[in-house]
């Protein structure tokens, strides 16, 4: 078993925010089961997909994303339509996914990036970086270390005693730091954080 532990520090502010969020989640849970309110759950899913893809510069509006989920056609670039449709398919997998399974992570990436990139569903075998214009602001973990780094991260997630709110954030940060895929890291990482939180509280 790996002894890897991500470098993070719990501050009073983080603990206070975690307690506040946990209390809010409990209050929502006590008031009513979200799964018994399909319209609210559906609206939340639409907003999640829209906001996640907007970060990736997808230009579709919330109304257009809603229309696509309802099976309607929208006038938009085909790739952006595929991004939305793929994201809905990936989020539909959430109830069946194991947050500690690398195979499930690869499955999600394959669905999320189907038809959008070569090698969807596989870890990258080349270097990758995050750029602001022409400036490199982050270089991902060297490709030959990616499988080992992801294995260590998943082992940590499965064995940590950190609160799920903290663990999900640490996992997401480390996931993006490793940048295991050639593309689609952001949207896949956000979905996986949702999955970790769902394991804690189904309202996510």
Where are each of the predicted segments found?
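FIC/Doc superfamily catalytic core
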Residues: 1-204
């Amino acid at each position: 078993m790996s002894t890897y532990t991500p470098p993070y520090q719990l501050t009073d502010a983080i603990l206070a925010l975690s307690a506040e969020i946990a209390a809010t989640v409990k209050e929502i849970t006590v008031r009513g089961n979200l799964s018994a309110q399909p319209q609210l759950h559906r609206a939340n899913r639409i907003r999640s997909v829209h906001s996640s893809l907007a970060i990736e510069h997808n230009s579709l509006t919330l109304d257009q994303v809603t229309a696509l989920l309802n099976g309607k056609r929208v006038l938009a670039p085909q790739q952006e339509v595929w991004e939305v449709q793929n994201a809905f398919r990936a989020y539909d997998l959430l109830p069946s996914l194991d947050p500690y399974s690398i195979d499930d992570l690869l499955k999600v990436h394959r669905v999320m990036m189907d038809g959008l990139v070569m090698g969807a569903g596989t870890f990258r075998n080349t270097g990758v970086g995050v750029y602001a214009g022409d400036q490199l602001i982050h270089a991902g973990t060297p490709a030959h270390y990616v499988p080992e780094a992801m294995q260590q991260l998943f082992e940590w997630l499965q064995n940590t005693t950190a609160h799920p709110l903290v663990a999900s954030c640490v996992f997401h940060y480390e996931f993006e730091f490793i940048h295991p895929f050639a593309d689609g890291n952001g949207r896949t990482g956000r979905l996986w954080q949702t999955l970790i939180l769902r394991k804690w509280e189904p309202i996510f």
